[in-house]
Amino acid sequence: MALSKVKLNDTFNKDQLLSTSKYTIQRSTGDNIDIPNYDVQKHLNKLCGMLLITEDANHKFTGLIGMLYAMSRLGREDTLKILKDAGYQVRANGVDVITHRQDVNGKEMKFEVLTLVSLTSEVQGNIEIESRKSYKKMLKEMGEVAPEYRHDFPDCGMIVLCVAALVITKLAAGDRSGLTAVIRRANNVLRNEMKRYKGLIPKDIANSFYEVFEKYPHYIDVFVHFGIAQSSTRGGSRVEGIFAGLFMNAYGAGQVMLRWGVLAKSVKNIMLGHASVQAEMEQVVEVYEYAQKLGGEAGFYHILNNPKASLLSLTQFPNFSSVVLGNAAGLGIMGEYRGTPRNQDLYDAAKAYAEQLKENGVINYSVLDLTTEELEAIKNQLNPKDNDVEL
């Protein structure tokens, strides 16, 4: 099938219909949800750290604790605003630190725990008990535990959230088919952190975040806004830099772009990952105009603002919308796609066109209807030879 035959089903009609709605939907987050403030951020970071130092840790609650940590960085007021703006009716539980007494092998011990409705004091106590066992083992092996190996090192919470940044890009698939890719990527980018923490098990932590995002969809909205806020904040630790790279690679540099779901103005529907290729697409000129209408998040924002990160995919696949450009590996042209494309016509046409480009060695930029500035950016970045490019 020719690429010219691949069309998006009545995109603009959908947009018009949704834009004229006079009503909004209110959702409930449940009876009570925990919304911690800045003052308990250090304690939540330590909880993440306890899980990270625990050898063979049980990560059942790691996703939840990671999200609580993210909210503590945003602060209670901003988290509430995010949820309310997303249409959620919120009954928020304040979170404080209290002393909890718990029996451990017949002996009463005291633990500092948080007043959470989502995580009992006993569970928090058990996390600390298990972490102490691993810490004692570390003391025997090392003699002295360096700060970056401890459970209270400042980047523990962000290490956990790096895994969440990888998971969030795969949610639109509707299942956990992206888990293997998440694990592979985490093993690569967090390899130094995995040397520090034996409890950093990407598969288990990723599954925990999948569970949280599936069970509590309001956390998706919170995490996306947290990711934007975190990535836009200057400075920070090395792990904060890793997080920003992971999140913005998904959100702002190509993979998380245009899909019909973006019309619903839903943050969840913007998070695409491999599912982007399964969505219905228009051809690039129409998509480009539509993306301009919707604003930077929807389309070719990254061409104008981050050409270095995106022009390679633009070079390889110029006749597709930005979401396909940014997710070329998922499309299968690079031989990475292992799923069944829902839009087989698009997949076949894209593959055929890419193979044609490869055989001819000529890239036709004219189909993109690019501005002079964009063409100049491409030339400056790629330094193409005149006989390699049709302008």
Curated annotation (Swiss-Prot):
Region (Interaction with the phosphoprotein): 244-290, 338-364
UniProt KW Cell membrane keyword: no
Principal localisation: virion
Originating organism: Bovine respiratory syncytial virus (strain 391-2) (BRS)
Primary role: Encapsidates the viral RNA genome by forming a left-handed helical nucleocapsid that protects the RNA from nucleases. RNA replication depends on the availability of soluble nucleoprotein. The encapsidated genomic RNA is termed the NC and serves as template for transcription and replication. Together with the phosphoprotein, sequesters host NF-kappa-B in inclusion bodies (IBs) thereby inhibiting this host defense pathway. May also act as a modulator of the innate immune response by sequestration of host IFIH1/MDA5 and MAVS into IBs.
UniProt cross-references to InterPro entries, sorted A to Z: Pneumo_ncap
Region (Involved in RNA synthesis and encapsidation): 1-364
Keywords from the named record: Capsid protein, Helical capsid protein, Host cytoplasm, Host-virus interaction, Inhibition of host innate immune response by virus, Inhibition of host interferon signaling pathway by virus, Inhibition of host MAVS by virus, Inhibition of host MDA5 by virus, Inhibition of host NF-kappa-B by virus, Inhibition of host PKR by virus, Inhibition of host RLR pathway by virus, Interferon antiviral system evasion, Phosphoprotein, Ribonucleoprotein, RNA-binding, Viral immunoevasion, Viral nucleoprotein, Virion
GO biological process, any: symbiont-mediated suppression of host NF-kappaB cascade
Superkingdom of origin organism: Viruses
PTM sites of type Phosphotyrosine: Y38
PTMs per UniProt: Tyrosine phosphorylation modulates viral transcription and replication.
Extent of the signal sequence: none
Record family assignment: Belongs to the paramyxoviruses nucleocapsid family.
Assembly behavior: Homomultimerizes to form the nucleocapsid. Binds to viral genomic RNA. Interacts with the phosphoprotein P. When in a monomeric RNA-free form, interacts with the phosphoprotein (via N-terminus). Interacts with protein M2-1; this interaction allows the association of nucleocapsid with the matrix protein. Interacts with host EIF2AK2/PKR; this interaction inhibits EIF2AK2 phosphorylation of EIF2S1 and blocks EIF2AK2-mediated translation shutoff.
GO molecular function, one term: RNA binding
Protein name: Nucleoprotein
Localisation per UniProt entry: Virion; Host cytoplasm
GO-annotated cellular components: helical viral capsid; host cell cytoplasm; ribonucleoprotein complex; viral nucleocapsid
